Amino acid sequence: MPIKLAQTNKEIKTTFNPFWSAAVVNEKNNWKNFKKFSAIFIKVIKVFIFIFLTIVGLWGCTQTLAQPWTGTNQVLGSGLEIGYKFGTTGDYRYDLISNNFGPYFTFSDYTLAYGPFYGWFVWPAAQIVLPIMYATRVPLGSGVELGFNMILSLIVLLLLVRLITIVITLNSTLALEKMNEVQGKLAEINAKYKGAIDLQSKRNRQLEIMSLYKKHNIKSSAAFVQVFVTLPIFLIIYRIVTTLRPIKAIILFNFWDLSKVPLTEIFSNFTTTGWPFIIFLVIVLPVQFLSQKLPQVWASKRNENAKAHSQKSIEQLNKTKKMQLIFYFVFAAITAFSAAGVGVYWFLNALFTLLQSYLTHVFIVKRREKRKQNYSKLDLILERE
């Protein structure tokens, strides 16, 4: 009798829910639908963010041509300035006051009167830099202000920006690494359809490349995303270093007036205040160049065994190098023709780029070594079996 009862219980357990399979299928379908909806929702959010940043970024670029108050004037007390209300600190370097020469526009409280770019981006970033500079300043009459407070505040701002964008930067770098790793297979696909001019062959080639990218989870837009995010950040910090009153008042190390334009000073006042800016450019420009060159060198070392063999891939690589060279000359021109404060920002930003690129390089190398060790362990297990 107990045996029969146990058998009956077993049968009841196995046949308790006749709709169990259907429930599992429905649950899986619901999960798939949820994943599809989530993916679509995330894409829509990304598109919205990109459109928003594009509009605001273009606004920030073009409003200088449309609005007179956005024209930066590096003379203290002229143009648009961000600082404290007159009489707040009693320090002329921080309190907003006109020099009575030309138009003057004060930005001491939050407002959208100067446009969304200034209100939503420049103002919040300035509220990080301004209090740090004031708290670490050399008080009037207590000594010479060498500008260490400005360097500290920009380092804090750049660190916060890097922490916010590190996920985007790392994903972009890893995506480019994956693209380098599959260059050999990509070269095989290109060689397979070499010389093919019919529409079907071109379509098949494109489908195979898309399949390869999908298999390795590669997004070809990764590099574009990084550039897209970097440009608005540059515009924000550019506006800060050209409109923040205490930065305009600084003579860095009692040697470089950050309100001056290096190239203008070199050609206009070479014997007095101009020649120090030659040293300034000699320091800043090579560091900018290294911040672009060294990451390429590290990437080449990582991908020595994964280089492309197709002529088309080599041509694409050469185009990339040319574009990077063009960018370098553009940045060099901006440094030479903008206020020296912009050059200080580029210098610090280049140092951050070098540090982040090196840490990313070490991370990728260690991750690859770990993968190799795991593969080696798996091979040993398979051999034993």
Curated annotation (Swiss-Prot):
Cell compartment(s), UniProt:
Cell membrane
User: Topology relative to the membrane, per the entry?
Assistant: Multi-pass membrane protein
**Signal peptide interval:** none
Its predominant location is membrane
Any one GO cellular component localisation term in the record: plasma membrane
- Keyword NADP in the entry? The reply is no
The identity of this protein, by name, is: Membrane protein insertase YidC
Q: Which organism is it from?
A: Mycoplasma genitalium (strain ATCC 33530 / DSM 19775 / NCTC 10195 / G37)
The gene it comes from is yidC
